Amino acid sequence: SFFKRFRINMKIHHEVISIHPESKTVSVKNLENGEIFEENYDKLILSPGAKPTQPRFPGVGIDKLFTLRTVEDTFRIKEYINKNHPKSAVLAGGGFIGLELAENLRELGMDVTIVQLLKQLMNPFDPDMASMIHNEMRKHGIKLVLGYTVEGFKEKDDGVEVLLKDNPSLQADMVVLAIGVTPDTVLAKEAGLELGIKESIVVNDRMETSVPDIYAAGDAVQVKHYVTGNDALISLAGPANKQGRIIADNICGGDSRYLGSQGSSVIKVFDMTAATTGINETNAKKSGLEVDTVILSPMSHAGYYPGGKVMTMKVVFEKESYRLLGAQIIGYEGVDKRIDVLATAIHAGLNATQLKDLDLAYAPPYSSAKDPVNMAGFMIDNIAKGTLKQWHLEDMDKISKDKDVVLIDVRTVCEFSRGHIDGFKNIPVDELRERISEIEKGKPVYLICQSGLRSYIASRILEGNGYETYNFSGGFRFYDAVVNDRALIERAYACGMDY
């Protein structure tokens, strides 16, 4: 038993109902018989976690509406499904819980719709990278209703009506709320502890609260973001476990410090893996940082070895200093190990250009001689040296209409015919030297290819011949995925449906 091994007395079916810091006691209620008694403490650790955000919508609380936080919540949902055999579900919220639940319900054969206030799923990712997640969800039959506001619910004989602001309502046999979590800090507030963001518990780097001899850890505490130093709420199991160890060490006379949360996370999205660490481009700019990014599409392992899969990587770094700030990776193989390398690099304070120098394990079944992380480093190093100048998706509208620039697509004729951007002239990279006279001198040349590699080669050829060039970050593959996704979202937003 737990007590026999660790000499820790576990009291299940008991609830702490109040904390008395002045007497160093807690009031405890036995949930089986209603008895209330006092327990003394020398040191008190609070780890109440977070509770599902409960919006004050009409209809919250009806029988066919669920929240998902605990194992017991899972049992309730599963019991309802096994008993009632629902054919459809609406999930309000597009974060980790929403996506994981959507996949599981879809595997049961249910029609699943996700409603999200933002125009993207998975807020830790930038909107452009989230497009890859949207595409995977749609590919597996998940309906996305992005940019919509839920206003309430009505119970019907045949299910639930989900009321949307200024749009037709949705119908489903069941609804699950997965719109985020809120620190569960009622006890802490009543005990007079200092509270921070969303009434989370404020702690120092020793995980001590504002009240002596009371510590706190987990989803209920406010932490410092490791990259920005700003106060943050980061509800992840990894940081919570580390915080618990630090508290135990300090209670036992040690002096351990929590350095902050980096937000490293990974999620399975059907056959795909999506992972992130540090801060994304959106939040970096909100923090007032001057940033740049590289977007690349490397293979998960050597291309000549069977089974390799393309992944999409976005690495965020600070201009001038080239401080590594964050990364996002989406793909079907090898995503998790690359994000872990980048998370380690950020924690170690590596300069983004130093990624090129990392000595990473290589064999054809597992990687390439230049690992995807190395490739990101080479690209950033080229930017630092002035060898590579980029242009980005947000520049497309302006650049594509500029009469004082030259637009060249260096993919093959076949690739170009399958889809291209208006205004671009097709000169395949292998014909570039012979056709260089077709490119007007004296004007900047903006290049694009499928992934960014051939357009980089073209830029080196043209730069060697006296041209000023800019390479499109991410290539046509990235552009096509993002633009098509945005078109689907906007069309759905205008029409009221994404299906």
Where do the protein language model's features map onto the residues?
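Glycine-rich dinucleotide-binding loop and its adjacent helix/turn
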Residues: 46-108, 197, 203-205, 425-429, ...
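Rhodanese-like catalytic fold shared by cysteine-dependent sulfurtransferases
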Residues: 353-364, 368-405, 413-444, 450-499
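FAD-site-proximal beta/loop scaffold in flavoenzymes
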Residues: 61-85, 161, 169-246, 341, ...
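Rossmann-like dinucleotide-binding cores of NAD(P)H-dependent redox enzymes
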Residues: 1, 88-89, 96-154, 234-240, ...
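Mid-to-C-terminal Rossmann-like scaffold of FAD/NAD(P)H-dependent oxidoreductases
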Residues: 220-333, 364-368, 372-398, 405
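A Rossmann-like FAD-binding core segment of flavoenzymes
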Residues: 11-28, 32, 39, 107-205
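Beta1-alpha1 glycine-rich phosphate/pyrophosphate-binding loop at the start
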Residues: 1-9, 13, 89, 102-125, ...
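Short hydrophobic core segments
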Residues: 39-49, 92, 170-180, 244, ...
